[in-house]
């Protein structure tokens, strides 16, 4: 039996079990898939599923990593199941720059690198990737290597390596080509029928690393109409495909056009007016240009004052019927500030959906006790706490009252007395309790207001140090709490993932409790359970799918 035939048989077998059990949990599905000894059972299929069940257990006991699961034939069969599901998925969170393949970028990039301004592009690329890198870009594989995040790279590097797509996205026509390419790839390869695209309306900035030739001639109108044209061209071929254009605004103070505007607020209000003028000029955009988002590093933007610059503009958009979404709770200096950033986004910007929201999924008791254990072990060895590190920031943010000397001993590496250790336990305990209360207060307000929360497992795992493994992702906890959830990939090419892989990761991380039907409901937006049951039943015996 070939590998392809084996995966096809596994897929059909799993479709049969899932449809007959109405999409129960993965663990129960796999148990039923090997139960008994029917004459129709194929021994190799049964053996493969039994092996995968053991691997699931090994994954949850930290014996193997998620890659081992994702590469297994049963995982590939489950991929086939999700790809064949008759109802396409909603990609709730995807950016343009990190979701363009090397095959698309390469020919357009080579025109720049071989053109009259090549030295300018060489300089820009070499600043990010190192001296001589640009001259060595020749093949699609070369580009692919540069646009993907490495295992030892994190958030700050991630923002920088989005450069190559930015270099080519300088015209209306290129935005149209990029949108069409994205729609075709996601629909045909990953059964995504609705895209909520995050894109930059204006890339003007004071940052020297982002001064790209051609940007000075690219207008907001070019960007929006280009993306619209590209998506609509695909929609004409595939009528069920749909999309929302979600312009993103960088939160950082220095991301504005200082050559034309005195302040970030002034530039932001100009962009808001530009969006509204576009809708007035081109009414056909109304169903598609109906929300905005904020992006960028939020570590230093958590206080109420940090939200004031964009408040007026968001208020204006709200009154025009726009939804406001925001990237918050993704990165932070301290966990409390991560929650505070979400809190202020809710109260000041009145967001309709929260993207990432990881600070609302970290267990404060586990988080702070891990910090305690880590620092006590280091203290016993006489190790200092590095000034400016995340541990140092958490220590500095705790309320030590009259016990600041304990904090200073931890930082300097002076051994703590037993009584001082007990006091440290009390301080971290009350800090955890306070943050936990704050978390639940914010989460309950989100539930009450119907604010959505978009989960991005690979992005959260690879770009932050907030949890050590995929299985610690809070998706299942959020689902049990009753939050309105969605799933996104962020920049799927950059992060080496895809939409169906994100679904598999969520399924594997809570194999015992997360029901397949519930995951399908989140992914498709379909809430009619009987209808979903019928769709599962219709999959039986139908091996044809998008190609």
Locations of regions flagged by a protein language model:
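Metal-cofactor-binding active-site regions of metalloenzymes
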Residues: 2-547
């Amino acid at each position: 039996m070939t590998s392809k035939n084996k995966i096809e048989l596994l897929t059909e077998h799993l479709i049969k079990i899932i449809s007959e059990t109405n999409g129960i949990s993965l663990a129960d599905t796999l148990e039923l898939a090997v139960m008994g000894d029917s004459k129709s059972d194929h021994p190799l299929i049964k053996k493969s599923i039994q092996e995968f069940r053991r691997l699931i257990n090994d994954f949850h006991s930290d014996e193997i990593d998620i890659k081992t699961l994702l590469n297994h034939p049963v995982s590939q069969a489950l991929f086939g199941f999700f790809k064949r599901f008759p109802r396409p998925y909603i990609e709730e969170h995807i950016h343009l720059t990190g979701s363009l393949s090397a095959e698309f970028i390469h020919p357009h990039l080579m025109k720049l690198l071989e053109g009259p301004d090549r030295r300018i592009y060489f300089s820009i690329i070499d600043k990010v990737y190192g001296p001589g890198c640009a001259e060595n870009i020749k093949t699609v594989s070369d580009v692919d290597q540069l646009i993907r995040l490495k295992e030892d790279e994190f958030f700050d590097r991630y923002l920088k390596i989005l450069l190559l797509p930015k270099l080519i996205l300088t015209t209306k026509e290129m935005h149209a080509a990029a949108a069409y390419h994205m729609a075709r790839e996601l629909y045909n390869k990953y059964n995504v029928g609705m895209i909520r695209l995050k894109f930059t309306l204006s890339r003007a900035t004071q940052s020297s690393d982002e001064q790209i030739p051609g940007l000075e001639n690219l207008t907001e109108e070019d960007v929006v109409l280009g993306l619209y044209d590209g998506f609509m061209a695909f929609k004409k071929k595939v009528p069920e495909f749909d999309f929302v254009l979600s312009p993103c605004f960088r939160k950082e103070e220095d991301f504005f056009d200082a050559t034309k505007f005195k302040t970030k607020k002034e530039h932001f209000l100009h962009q808001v007016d530009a969006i509204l003028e576009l809708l007035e000029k081109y009414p056909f955009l109304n169903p598609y240009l109906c929300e905005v988002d904020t992006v960028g590093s939020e570590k230093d933007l958590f206080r109420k004052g940090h939200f004031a610059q964009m408040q007026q503009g968001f208020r204006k958009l709200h009154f025009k019927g726009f939804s406001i979404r925001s990237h918050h709770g993704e990165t932070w200096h301290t966990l409390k500030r991560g929650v505070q950033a979400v809190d202020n986004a809710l109260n000041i910007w009145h967001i309709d959906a929260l993207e990432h929201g990881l600070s609302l999924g970290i267990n404060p008791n586990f988080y702070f006790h891990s910090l305690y254990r880590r620092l006590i072990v280091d203290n016993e060895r006489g190790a200092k706490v590095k000034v400016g590190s995340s541990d140092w920031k958490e220590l500095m943010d705790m309320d030590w009252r009259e016990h600041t000397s304990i904090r200073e001993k931890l930082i300097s590496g002076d051994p703590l007395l037993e009584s001082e250790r007990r006091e440290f336990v009390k301080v971290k305990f009350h800090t955890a309790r306070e943050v936990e209360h704050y978390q639940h207060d914010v989460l309950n307000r989100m539930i009450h207001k119907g604010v959505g929360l978009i989960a991005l497992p690979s992005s959260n795992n690879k770009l932050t140090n907030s949890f050590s493994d995929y299985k610690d992702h809070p998706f299942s906890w959020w689902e049990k709490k009753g939050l309105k959830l969605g799933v996104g990939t962020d920049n799927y090419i950059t992060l080496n993932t895809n939409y169906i892989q994100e679904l598999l990761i969520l399924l594997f991380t809570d194999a015992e409790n997360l029901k397949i039907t519930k995951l399908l409901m989140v992914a498709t937006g379909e809430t009619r359970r009987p209808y979903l049951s019928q769709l599962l039943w219709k999959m039986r015996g139908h091996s044809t799918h998008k190609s």
